[in-house]
Design a protein with these regions (language model features):
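Fe-S-dependent hydro-lyases/dehydratases of central metabolism
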Residues: 1-271
């Protein structure tokens, strides 16, 4: 389960109207969502046509800053006041969230990845990155899938597999060893199955550069939107979490890690 799965499930439920023109506040009641998940969810409120999406700062936020050596924040905490009213008050139990894949041509056109896997949808490219899923933790989750899949003999991506780190800092960080990968770096794990690491930019997310989709091509991506012609004129983009994209690259068709014999285990794949 990831932030991408959560937001695709929300957009599936809401359709194209519920959050249109709204400000959306998310409350992580159990304080369990890491910043990478929150970033993905809030970022993709643009795809819900909302004015904005926010998580009020809490101890998870402050801990994230402290780990980066930032303790004195220049702005006060912003949160809804006690008398705030909401046009819609909705609860989503994370127990209801499964790995998801959004089909063309809307992020809300989302389905359980296990159901999509039964269709054996073929594709040309598996692409990980974008402002919604290019953080170190996003890439680590994908690398953990590959790392554990290699133990099952899956050692080669069956399709073009390209990764776009979310920033120059992330690009440098993924070259360093990570203990959760047995001392390998994320980049080494990606390259071990034939993955390619690109510069940090939007690229095919908005149909630019050599990795953009050509007419008739299809890609499964961790990008934020899959509108018609978005990733390249005449191409078809599907949306999923980095973990699902990595699993699909190994499987050769769109599928969650469970299709590789890797059921979700928060102790193994959680970030």
């Amino acid at each position: 389960m990831s932030g991408k799965d959560i937001v695709l499930e929300l957009l599936r439920r809401w359709g194209s109207q519920q959050s249109q023109g709204m400000s959306v506040e998310f409350v992580d009641a159990n304080r369990q969502l890491p910043i990478a998940y929150r970033n993905t969810i809030a970022n993709m409120m643009a795809e819900g046509e909302a004015l904005n999406g926010i998580f009020a700062a809490d101890e998870i936020t402050y801990t994230w800053y402290e780990r980066k050596g930032i303790r004195d924040l220049p702005y006060p905490r912003i949160a809804a006041g006690e008398g705030a009213t909401f046009d819609i008050d909705e609860t989503l139990s994370l127990d209801e969230v499964r790995p998801m894949i959004a089909k063309p041509f809307s992020p809300g056109n989302a389905f359980a990845a296990e159901e999509v896997a039964r269709e054996r949808i073929q594709f040309d490219k598996a692409l990980i990155g974008s402002c919604t899923n290019g953080s170190y933790d996003d890439l680590l989750q994908a690398a953990l899938v590959i790392y554990n899949a290699r133990e099952k003999g899956l050692r080669k991506a069956t399709r073009t597999f390209v990764v776009f780190p979310g920033s120059g800092g992330v690009a440098r960080q993924i070259e360093r060893p990570d203990p959760r990968l047995g001392g390998e770096s994320i980049a080494e794990v990606f390259r071990s199955i034939g993955g390619q690491i690109r510069a940090s930019w939007c690229g095919p997310c908005f149909g630019q550069g050599p990795d953009a989709l050509a007419k008739g091509e299809r890609a499964i991506t961790s990008f934020n939107r899959n509108w018609q012609n978005r990733m390249g004129v005449g191409g078809e983009g599907y949306l999923a979490s980095p973990a699902v994209v990595a699993a699909s690259a190994l499987a050769g068709y769109m599928a969650p890690p469970s299709e590789l014999g890797l059921p979700w285990d928060p102790d193994v794949y959680g970030i």
